From Swiss-Prot:
Propeptide residue interval(s): 196-198
Localisation per UniProt entry: Cell membrane
Family affiliation: Belongs to the small GTPase superfamily. Ras family.
Taxonomic classification: Eukaryota, Fungi, Fungi incertae sedis, Mucoromycota, Mucoromycotina
Protein residues bound to GTP: 18-25, 65-69, 124-127
Membrane topology: Lipid-anchor
PROSITE patterns: RAS
Coiled-coil region: none
Protein name: Ras-like protein 2
Amino acid sequence: MSTKGAAFLKEYKIVMVGDGGVGKSAMTIQFIQSTFVDEYDPTIEDSYRKQCLIDSECAMLDILDTAGQEEYSAMRERFMRNGEGFVLIYSITSYHTFEQVQKLHEQIARVKDLEHFPMVLVGNKCDLEQDRQVPTSAGRDLAKQYNCQFFEASAKQNVRIQDAFHGLVREIRRSQQEKCKKQKQYDEKQASLCCIVM
């Protein structure tokens, strides 16, 4: 790629959010490296980058894998402030993690001072159907409440992992286009007010 082409590569800041052990790191590494990491090693903070072609547009995904443990809540808020889009993850094998996702959603909304922000909801570990505690319908209903896309995924089997990340980039793009449109309308309204005053 030429340096001129690289200068126009749009970067998207994505934050992985969910309780400890839901598979945030496994999902991220599966997306970045097409590898499943079996052992659980609690993350404090890891950052990954991947260039993708999404809907014929190049995108650089800057993915921040955050700590799920409560003691890192203050650090997580800093990441939330800077994130453009969020992958909210729970494990279908743990209802507690589903409840935590709702608390994390509230935390993001408070930190960003926004009711709606680009996000996708992911029920991970769909390969463990025999251990399911969270019905698919509960995830679907929560996503409808949040007005976001919902995916049941498996980091282990690489099921719908790419769909979730690409879906989030589409949401970020849509949100940015809406902001630009509103700003343009506001600017035009201000310009017309200036003309009237003169």
